[in-house]
Amino acid sequence: MARLEVDILTLFPRMCAGYLGESILGKAQEAGLLAATITDIRDHATGKHRVCDDAPYGGGAGMVMKPEPLVEAIEAARARLPGAWVVLTSPRGARLDQALARRFAEHGRLILACGRYEGVDERVMTAVDMQVSIGDFVLTGGELAALCVVDAAARLVPGVLGNAASADAESFAGVEGLLEHPQYTRPPEFRGMKVPEVLLSGDHRRIERWRRREALRATRERRPDLFARLSLPESDLRLIEAGDDEL
């Protein structure tokens, strides 16, 4: 049975525990499809106060995470999870996307090291396999990014989602990487806004064409960078401009 094993290394374990225990991720752990461990980096620090940061050499604002506690935490995690990839969450890293999330899910073992303060001592990089970012912005720490990695990868593990087709139909899924089409549920009318007639028609061919058209339109309008990379057949180019009565 495929499953995802992760160990999150953090200075603030409680920030991660609540999220991992709820909803789909909590159920995945109960089912044995996700094994999530949270390690307090301070457990590998020395001294009465278990200090994990210090002033940067050369001066400057803020503090830097010391190498000893984090590297020792990584080494201990590697011993628990042989073959795991060590991923440092950092704005300097490669951008997390659906393809990378799938690689993580398929590999099955991750050690996620969460940075804090002004950054991590560069010597820690000798113990890291890759750095990953969730966007071109800076957070207070790497915990939110680590949770994004776990969530994105775990939902791709077979059995985690109730409907196996859900992950395949979502935004960025598949080879093309289109944004997902709009979704509707009951009631059929809300404050004068009606569900598109085609979705109520029961005509599955029209519904699939409508979803394809809306996914193409959403990608063109909201992510022109993705749309520009697509090699669309003539039928898709016509579909984008088609009205509901032409589906």
From Swiss-Prot:
MF GO annotations: tRNA (guanine(37)-N1)-methyltransferase activity
GO cellular component: cytosol
EC number: 2.1.1.228
Catalytic activity as recorded in UniProt: guanosine(37) in tRNA + S-adenosyl-L-methionine = N(1)-methylguanosine(37) in tRNA + S-adenosyl-L-homocysteine + H(+)
SUPFAM superfamilies named among the record's database cross-references: alpha/beta knot (SSF75217)
Compartments where located: Cytoplasm
S-S bridge residues: none
TM ranges: none
GO biological process: tRNA N1-guanine methylation
Keywords: Cytoplasm, Methyltransferase, S-adenosyl-L-methionine, Transferase, tRNA processing
Entries under CDD domains matching the protein: TrmD-like (cd18080)
Keyword hit for Electron transport: no
Subunit structure: Homodimer.
HAMAP family: TrmD
Entry's family note: Belongs to the RNA methyltransferase TrmD family.
Record's protein name: tRNA (guanine-N(1)-)-methyltransferase
